[in-house]
Amino acid sequence: MNKPFLILLIALIAFSGCNMRKYFKPAKHQIKGEAYFPNHLQESIVSSNRYGAILKNGAVIGDKGLTQLRIGKNFNYESSFLNESQGFFILAQDCLNKIDKKTSKSRAAKTEETELKLKGVEAEVQDKVCHQVELISNNPNASQQSIVIPLETFALSASVKGNLLAVVLADNSANLYDITSQKLLFSEKGSPSTTINSLMAMPIFMDTVVVFPMLDGRLLVVDYVHGNPTPIRNIVISSDKFFNNITYLIVDGNNMIASTGKRILSVVSGQEFNYDGDIVDLLYDKGTLYVLTLDGQILQMDKSLRELNSVKLPFASLNTIVLNNNKLYSLEKRGYVIEVDLNDFDSYNVYKTPTIGSFKFFSSNRLDKGVFYDKNRVYYDRYYLDYNDFKPKLYPHAAEFKTSQKGEKGNAPIYLQERHKAKENKQPLEENKVKPRNSGFEEEEVKTRRPEPTKDQNNAIQQGETKNNESKNTPISKENAAKKEAPKPSSKEEKRRLKEEKKKAKAEQRAREFEQRAREHQERDEKELEERRKALEMNKK
């Protein structure tokens, strides 16, 4: 085969393979209007995590907006914002970056002796590379504005309670420090993890324990009240090799929800529930969980991870979850704002994000700059949108606009639309049942068995027939006409009904599984209590 032709063929195959990738692109009639990011920041975002973002000028954005913290440029170390906890801004600092090697070389004579000395100095500096956590008080009148605690390696997440600092380090170790004495009270290292998700959860202090979100897909529970800090439980969520760190962790009373990129774990009063999927982000609010998935779904779940509602946007790459005014908002990476009404999860609105002046908001039609969001705002590069004041520019056809249904063009199963209609009518879907009729043979048998009517009976029958004829001649009422003209269910309606029945059966099955798991947990707890009681009796003897 001709070599140039072979190269051209390979190039065409590769190019066609790249073009096969599909992106979220709603039809024009589905786009309700334009959503602007009208507010400006002084500088653009250079780095962000789940709890904050750093701007180019060193300003820090937290979960309540712009803070008074400013991270100055220092040639001896780099700082990263981790979290704001218990009145402290927590910064992770790495002293690796600026070794004064060039100036030493320029000042020293280029002799073998000075080069050997320089190498010795460099080796000594490398041995003394420092990592530390700095706690900066957010109270300007505090007696001690800054506390620095040296670490063995770089800190990835941290939180404070009272005089204790809980830190998860890059070597997958959980550490507990006394802030006043800077003494290490507890440390336990897990298996190393080479790649992690940037959405790193922070440790959470409870009444008697602290929960560490580890990099290897597990939760380490440490008792810090009764004597020396002691690990009391390991909860394994996922065992994947890559990107397996805990990305989300929240405690709500007796309930706890944690997640990696592949699995969600919910602990409800001691009972565990799991959900597996490609998880982008999630948000827990007032007993309900909202999940973004890699395939463009927005899921609504209860605490037992039972799916309540869902919206599917084909090929959408979703980012950020903001709940405001009973609506859910999410950014789509190709330049759209998605709006879902929490009262009507069967539909959604799409708003396009336009170009702002000479600055193209989404370069190459892709959200590829720094992003951060809090309870009410979404920050992108140097702009932000406050959903408390969300005023999109509606297109002229918006007055006649129908919110995009989940069943349109394969967006989601059609039966969910019928489910919504059933909610409105407050009546379950029912199949029109036709009453069984007797066959002609059965009618003849009945006639033969009937006794012949007497004369009086014949008169009564004739009068009844005349009345029936009169009633037939009278005009038919609207209700009776509607009943007679009621069409038979179509094949589509029948399919919807069957799907609804399947979903109902599935929900009942989940409820039975829930009860079964609850019984198993109860039996296990009773068994453990019995074993402990026997052990105590043996010890007494």
Curated annotation (Swiss-Prot):
Q: Where in the cell is it found?
A: Cell surface
Which Pfam families does this one have? PGBA_C (PF15437)
Gene that encodes it: pgbB
| Name of the protein | Plasminogen-binding protein PgbB
Its cellular-component GO annotations read:
cell surface
Protein's job = Binds plasminogen, specifically, and in a concentration and lysine-dependent manner. Plasminogen is the precursor of plasmin, a serine protease that cleaves fibrin, fibronectin, laminin and vitronectin. Acquisition of plasminogen/plasmin could enable H.pylori to degrade host components.
Biased segments, Polar residues type:
456-476
Locations of Basic and acidic residues compositional bias? 420-434, 446-455, 480-541
Coarse class of the protein's main subcellular location? other
What superkingdom does the record give? Answer: Bacteria
Further information in the entry reads: Plasminogen bound to PgbB is capable of being converted to functionally active plasmin.
Q: Where is this region: Disordered?
A: 420-541
